[in-house]
Regions:
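N-terminal glycine-rich phosphate-binding loop and ensuing alpha1 helix
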Residues: 1-63, 110
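A short, conserved beta-strand element in the Rossmann-like catalytic core
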Residues: 6, 120-122
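Well-ordered alpha-helical segments embedded in enzymatic catalytic cores
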Residues: 26-30, 99-103, 128
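Residue-level signal for inorganic ion chemistry
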Residues: 27, 104, 118, 148
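Structural beta-sheet core signal
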Residues: 44, 75, 114, 144-145
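Short phosphate-binding loop-to-helix
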Residues: 63-111
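Short beta-strand-to-loop acidic/aromatic patch adjacent to the donor-nucleotide binding site
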Residues: 109-120
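Conserved core of the sugar-phosphate nucleotidyltransferase
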Residues: 123-157
Length: 157
């Protein structure tokens, strides 16, 4: 998911901020780890207004890498118009994870994992989730990667 508006970030598109000298962003690492774990489809859930920048910073590069590895790439757009029912007056922000998954409903046709574009989870998480998703489970079975809070916070919280 990369449709957040980054209102606390302080400028630019948070999901597209470089984290190293080579211009990689957190999603580069996440996608690499997911593919290595066995995931074979990447769906970017973004806002329509960042599509051009998104494709320039990461989309085109990831599409090329995925094409070499036989991994499918899709795009969908999170929008306030995708909300069933009516919006509270003045609402300007997307509704978060649930609404993001709803925006991707046409591209999801089996078990899937959802990540935030600006969080790094680590290689083992993708392997654990992929292994779980490849097992037989009842239709109403779900999983979540859990973390020990003190191991996830910086000195600044």
């Amino acid at each position: 998911m990369a449709a957040g508006i980054g209102s606390r970030f302080g400028g630019g598109i948070k999901q597209l901020a470089s984290v190293d000298d080579s211009g990689h962003i957190i999603m580069d690492y996440s996608i690499h780890d997911a593919i290595a774990a066995g995931f074979n489809k990447i769906v970017f859930i973004i806002r329509k207004d960042i599509e051009k920048d998104f494709r320039e910073v990461i989309g085109n590069r990831i599409e090329a890498v995925c094409a070499q590895k036989g991994v499918e790439v899709g795009y969908c757009f999170q929008s306030l118009t995708d909300i069933p029912g009516s919006l509270p007056e003045g609402r300007t922000k997307p509704w978060g994870t649930g609404q993001a998954v709803l925006a991707a409903k046409e591209l999801i046709d089996g078990p899937f994992a959802v990540i935030n574009a600006d969080d790094y989870y680590g290689k083992s998480v993708y392997t654990s989730i992929h292994d779980y998703l490849c097992q037989d489970h009842p239709d109403n079975a779900f999983c979540m990667a859990g973390f020990i809070l003190k191991n996830t916070l910086s000195k600044n919280g």
